[in-house]
Structure formats: structure tokens, C-alpha cells
Design a protein with these regions (language model features):
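Bacterial N-terminal signal peptides that target proteins for export
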Residues: 1-4
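Residues embedded in well-ordered secondary-structure elements
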Residues: 8, 21, 62-64
């Protein structure tokens, strides 16, 4: 569907238009999520919060700040199924990713939930 048609469809149908998420933001979400998975033992023992899988939303509620310094994410994680089962998270991670989304700039926290 052409961009103009999508815009017209959204306007006339009363549906909200989706915000565009930059490629750098998508890379940043993926990098932050994969860093946390690898560092915390792999998917067999650790799964980040569901917001970290929402690349179309740029990280959703996990994205705390996006500016010229890059992307700052704060999210929890736990054993596989922790959110679906309603159990407590076992980790909390604060990670800053470069503005281009390609480098972990700083991990200010990766420990027990605060």
C-alpha cells in the first residue's frame, strides 16, 4: 500500500496512524535485549520483559530516554514465563545504547530488582 493511501485510510477510517521508529532505535532495542539475554545466562534461564520484544514500538515502556546521547532502556527480566505466570522478576537492567544503535555505551545496573 502506498504511503499516501495508508495515510488516507487512517484518516478516513478513524484509526490512529502508527509512529515511525528509526532503524537506530530498532537496532538499539535488539542490542540491549540481546546483551541482557547473553549476560544473564541465555534464554533457557532468563527472558527480558515483553516490552523489549516490541521493536515496532521502539522498546515501548522500557525505553526511558532517547536523545543525542543515545537510547536508555530500563527493564526487568526473569525465568522463562515469569510475566505470563505472574512471578517476580529476578533481574533489573539499565543500559545505554549509542545513538546509531550499534554499541552498548554503558550498563549502569544489572542486578536484583530495586
Amino acid at each position: 500500500m502506498a504511503a499516501g493511501v495508508a495515510t488516507a485510510t487512517a484518516l478516513f477510517s478513524g484509526l490512529p496512524m502508527l509512529a515511525q521508529v528509526s532503524d537506530a532505535n530498532v537496532r538499539a532495542v535488539n542490542l540491549a535485549r540481546n546483551w541482557a539475554i547473553t549476560t544473564n545466562g541465555g534464554l533457557s534461564v532468563y527472558v527480558p520483559a515483553s516490552c523489549m520484544f516490541k521493536t515496532a514500538d521502539g522498546g515501548g515502556s522500557c525505553l526511558v530516554q532517547s536523545n543525542s546521547q543515545g537510547f536508555f532502556f530500563r527493564f526487568r527480566g526473569g525465568a522463562p514465563g515469569w510475566q505470563q505466570l505472574g512471578t517476580a522478576a529476578t533481574r533489573e537492567t539499565d543500559v545505554q545504547i549509542s545513538p546509531d544503535g550499534r554499541t552498548v555505551v554503558n550498563v549502569s545496573y544489572n542486578g536484583r530488582p530495586r
